[in-house]
C-alpha cells in the first residue's frame, strides 16, 4: 500500500509540474534557426566561378547566385574560401546556405550533401604543355601527375586505380587548380587534371596548354546544399532552376562564359598588321583626337587588346565597345552609348588619364602607362596589393619590371590571403599589358614606315556617330547583365 501511495504521489507531482509549463512549450525540442536575411553563398575563386577585376565582379556562379538572391528577394552575400575543406566546413556549421563554386557531382559528394540540378556539364581532361609528350595511356600518368586534394579528380583517379594498379599521383592542398594549370604552362609540372571549361578559359592567355586524355565525360556541375534541414531552400532552388531554364537564362550564361572560349584564336603579329591596314584607318582620327597628352598609338593598342577595334564588341562580363567600358564607368565618364566609337574612345582615354593621375608620384613617367593599363584590367586596389608584395620581397614597387614579377602571385593563396583586396588574375594582367606593349611597338614601326599625312574621318564613321550619339545605347536581346 505504501509503495502504491508513493507511485501515485510521483505521478501527481509530474502532472502538476507539467501543468505549470507555459502553454505550447515543448521541453528540450530543438528550435529551428531563424531564416537568414541574406542569401549566404560560399564559393571559390576562378574565372568561370567568382572573381573581382577592374571591370567588377563576374563568374557563372556569381551571376546565377545573384539572380537566385533576387528571386528570393534577399541581398546576396557571397563569401570566397581558400579551399574546398574550408568551404565544406562552413556549410556543415551553417555559416553559409549553399555552395556555388563550379563543383561537379561525385559519389562522395552525393553521400555528404544534397545536389542541386545540373547547371552545365564538363569533361575531366589531362592537361600538359605543348612540346611535352602527350600521354597516350593512364599508365603514363603515374608519378607525373599532380591534382588538388578533396577534388573530384581524386575520386576519379581512385576508381581508375582499381583497374590500373600502378597508377599513382600527388595531391596538394596548398594550391588551387588554376595554379596547377599555370605550373603546367611554365613547365614546372608534367600533368594535371582540369575541367574542360577551365582549360579552355586558361588557354586564352596560356596558349601553350594542351588537352590530353579525357577521364570522365559530361560530368554535371551542381550547387551543394546541407544534407539536413534544407528542404525549403532546395524546393525554392528547383523552382528557380525551372524558371530560369524556361527563360533561357541558363543557356545564355553557358554561352556567355563557355560558348566562345573554344573558338578563341591567339592573335599573332601578322593578324594585328592586317588589322592595322583593314580597320585602323577608320578609327585613327578618333584615337589622335582624344589621346591628348597620351601617345595615340598606346591608346589604339589598348583598344585593340580590348575589342580588336570592333565598336560592337562585348565580353562575358558585360563590358562593351571599342574600349570595353562597364556601365558604371561609362556613366561616370558621361558616355551614354558605349557602342559609339567616338564616345567609347573618348571615355577610355579619359579613364586611362584618370588612372595615371591616381598612381603614386614615385612611378616614373615612362612607366605610368603600363601601371595604368594593369589597373584598367584588374583595378587599382589589386595593383596596389601587387606593389606592396613587391616591396615586401625587396623589389621596387615603382618599377614595372619588378611589379610584373609579383602580379601572378595574386592568384596564389599563400600571397593573396595577405592582401587587402584578395584574389586577382594577376598573370592575366601581365599578359594584357605585355600584349599592348607588343601591339604598340608594332604600331610605332608601321607608323614610321608611312607618310605623316593627317587622315580624315571617313564618312561611314560620321554617319554612325550621327545615329548613335543622338540617343542612348540601343537595347540587346540578351537577358539583363
Swiss-Prot record:
Annotated region (Non-LT domain), positions in chain: 20-261
Alphabetized PANTHER family for the sequence: MEMBRANE-BOUND LYTIC MUREIN TRANSGLYCOSYLASE F
Subcellular localization(s) per the UniProt record: Cell outer membrane
Active site per database record: 306
EC number: 4.2.2.n1
Segments for region (Disordered): 450-481
One GO CC term, this protein: cell outer membrane
UniProt keyword list: Cell outer membrane, Cell wall biogenesis/degradation, Lyase, Membrane, Signal
Lineage: Bacteria, Pseudomonadati, Pseudomonadota, Gammaproteobacteria, Alteromonadales
GO MF terms, alphabetically ordered: peptidoglycan lytic transglycosylase activity
Primary residence: membrane
Catalysed reaction, written as an equation: Exolytic cleavage of the (1->4)-beta-glycosidic linkage between N-acetylmuramic acid (MurNAc) and N-acetylglucosamine (GlcNAc) residues in peptidoglycan, from either the reducing or the non-reducing ends of the peptidoglycan chains, with concomitant formation of a 1,6-anhydrobond in the MurNAc residue
Name of the protein this chain belongs to: Membrane-bound lytic murein transglycosylase F
GO terms, biological process: cell wall macromolecule catabolic process; cell wall organization; peptidoglycan catabolic process
Family the UniProt entry places it in: In the N-terminal section; belongs to the bacterial solute-binding protein 3 family. In the C-terminal section; belongs to the transglycosylase Slt family.
Amino acid at each position: 500500500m505504501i509503495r502504491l501511495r508513493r507511485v501515485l504521489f510521483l505521478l501527481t507531482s509530474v502532472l502538476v509540474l507539467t501543468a505549470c509549463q507555459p502553454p505550447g512549450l515543448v521541453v528540450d525540442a530543438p528550435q529551428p534557426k531563424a531564416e537568414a536575411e541574406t542569401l549566404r553563398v560560399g564559393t571559390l575563386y576562378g574565372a568561370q566561378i567568382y572573381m573581382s577585376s577592374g571591370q567588377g565582379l563576374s563568374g557563372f556562379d556569381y551571376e546565377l547566385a545573384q539572380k537566385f538572391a533576387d528571386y528570393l528577394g534577399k541581398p546576396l552575400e557571397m563569401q570566397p574560401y581558400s579551399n574546398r575543406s574550408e568551404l565544406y566546413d562552413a556549410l556543415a556549421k551553417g555559416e553559409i546556405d549553399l555552395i556555388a563554386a563550379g563543383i561537379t557531382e561525385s559519389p562522395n559528394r552525393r553521400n555528404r550533401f544534397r545536389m542541386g540540378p545540373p547547371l552545365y556539364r564538363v569533361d575531366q581532361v589531362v592537361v600538359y604543355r605543348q612540346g611535352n609528350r602527350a600521354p597516350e595511356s593512364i599508365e603514363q600518368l603515374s608519378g607525373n601527375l599532380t591534382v588538388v586534394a578533396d577534388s573530384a579528380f581524386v575520386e576519379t583517379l581512385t576508381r581508375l586505380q582499381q583497374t590500373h594498379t600502378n597508377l599513382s599521383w600527388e595531391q596538394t592542398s596548398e594550391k588551387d587548380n588554376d595554379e596547377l594549370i599555370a605550373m603546367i604552362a611554365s613547365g614546372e609540372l608534367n600533368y594535371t587534371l582540369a575541367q574542360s571549361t577551365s582549360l579552355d578559359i586558361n588557354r586564352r592567355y596560356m596558349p601553350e596548354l594542351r588537352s590530353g586524355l579525357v577521364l570522365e565525360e559530361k560530368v554535371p556541375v551542381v550547387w551543394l546544399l546541407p544534407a539536413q534541414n534544407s528542404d525549403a531552400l532546395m524546393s525554392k532552388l528547383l523552382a528557380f532552376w525551372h524558371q530560369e531554364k524556361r527563360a533561357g537564362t541558363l543557356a545564355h550564361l553557358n554561352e556567355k562564359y563557355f560558348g566562345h572560349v573554344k573558338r578563341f584564336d591567339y592573335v599573332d603579329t601578322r593578324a594585328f598588321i592586317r588589322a592595322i591596314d583593314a580597320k585602323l584607318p577608320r578609327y585613327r582620327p578618333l584615337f589622335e583626337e582624344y589621346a591628348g597628352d597620351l601617345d595615340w598609338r598606346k591608346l589604339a593598342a589598348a583598344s585593340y587588346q580590348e575589342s580588336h577595334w570592333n565598336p560592337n564588341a562585348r565580353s562575358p562580363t558585360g563590358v562593351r565597345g571599342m574600349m570595353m567600358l562597364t556601365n558604371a564607368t561609362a556613366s561616370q565618364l558621361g558616355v551614354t552609348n558605349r557602342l559609339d566609337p567616338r564616345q567609347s574612345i573618348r571615355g577610355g582615354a579619359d579613364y586611362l588619364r584618370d588612372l595615371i593621375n591616381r598612381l603614386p608620384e614615385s612611378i616614373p613617367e615612362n612607366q605610368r602607362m603600363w601601371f595604368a593599363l594593369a589597373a584598367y584590367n584588374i583595378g587599382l586596389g589589386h595593383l596596389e596589393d601587387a606593389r606592396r608584395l613587391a616591396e615586401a620581397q625587396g623589389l621596387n614597387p615603382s618599377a614595372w619590371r619588378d611589379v610584373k614579377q609579383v602580379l601572378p602571385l595574386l592568384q596564389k593563396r599563400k600571397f593573396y590571403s595577405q592582401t587587402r583586396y584578395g584574389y586577382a588574375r594577376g598573370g592575366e594582367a601581365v599578359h594584357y599589358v605585355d600584349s599592348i606593349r607588343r601591339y604598340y611597338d608594332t604600331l610605332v614601326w608601321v607608323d614610321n614606315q608611312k607618310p605623316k599625312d593627317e587622315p580624315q574621318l571617313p564618312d561611314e564613321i560620321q554617319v554612325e556617330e550621327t545615329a548613335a550619339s543622338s540617343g542612348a545605347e540601343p537595347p540587346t536581346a540578351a537577358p539583363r547583365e
